[in-house]
Regions:
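Beta-hairpin "wing" of winged helix-turn-helix
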Residues: 54-64, 71
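Positively charged, low-complexity intrinsically disordered regions
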Residues: 20, 49, 64, 68, ...
Length: 108
């Protein structure tokens, strides 16, 4: 991880393939090969995306024989994004939003 943990998380989330990997992992663990099979890109490209997600602390990996199994590190994502939101949004706005009372933006 870098000296800017939030920065590494946002950089990792900036890529749509990495966001899709996280969404694919939301229901549970997947092997690297299972993840790669879901995308029309090369295995080495998926490996690089997984490496970036791992470096940002957004996925965990474990070995199962010769397979590498990945899962979402949801608490890391929640803490980082929650910390960022609380730093840039007024507390009252966050409280209203959590209660479902946030004003809806006007659509023109």
């Amino acid at each position: 991880m870098t000296d800017d943990p939030a920065g590494s998380v946002f950089r990792a989330l900036a890529d749509p393939t990495r966001r899709q990997i996280l969404e694919d992992l939301r229901d549970g663990e997947l092997a690297a090969g299972e993840i790669a099979a879901r995308f029309p890109i090369t295995g080495p490209s998926i490996s690089r995306h997984l490496s970036i997600l791992r470096a940002a602390g957004l996925v965990r990996e474990r070995r199962d024989g010769n397979r590498i199994i990945y899962s979402v590190a949801a608490e890391r994502l929640a803490v980082c994004l929650g910390g960022f939101l609380s730093a840039v949004c007024p507390d009252q706005m966050l409280l209203r939003h959590r209660r479902g009372q946030a004003a809806q933006p006007e659509v023109q």
